[in-house]
């Protein structure tokens, strides 16, 4: 009997001592919510992850997505072996025509946004973590700035999606991948979605993003330039497609106000002298 008691006692001792958290150490190279979101630098590092998706030149490799000129063979300025293949394939005379007789390649060359809400979820997570973990640990100005940065990138994604697909589901917060009801929710109207974008731009992005947060970093003037573009597009779409005229007017008014932020800054000109683009000593 004594033997069994000793075995049981030994098992209990091992069970209670083996879980001593003195042996637990957080991983130094894998951030978690418990160890991250402590300082403004943490917010900056997380925000840096958005740049490669939205701004050309911040990723590795190269891409022609959203480029106004995707190679000279796309235009009539250049011909290769007597043919302008990219131009003729991208602008066929009839559906399915191409200079090779195959299905026109323009049908597989779409480079705009796909039905993907990854970056919206990333922005929602950003805002939620700021609210839960950083509010009170950083200054109010810093918190408002980074929350507005997250809102800007959320607006960026929704403006793209609405421009391409029209009605899309709007997600106020993130959700678990097991929440099928949220994952497969119905689309919201484009006016509902763009009203959300309008509110974030007007009340947060154009107010709280810093006017200067360092070189090669999002600032209020960059945000205002994009806001003006998005509101101009959606305002004119609503106006000339017989949409919501009240929404059209307020979108266009915000486009004007956002453009004035850029103009009144006195920091930008309509064009940059060509020599300055390639001959600047400080790359500014």
Q: Where do the protein language model's features map onto the residues?
A:
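Short linear capping/connector segments at secondary-structure termini
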Residues: 29-32, 139, 173-181
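Conserved, well-structured interaction surfaces
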Residues: 44-48, 52-58, 62, 84-165, ...
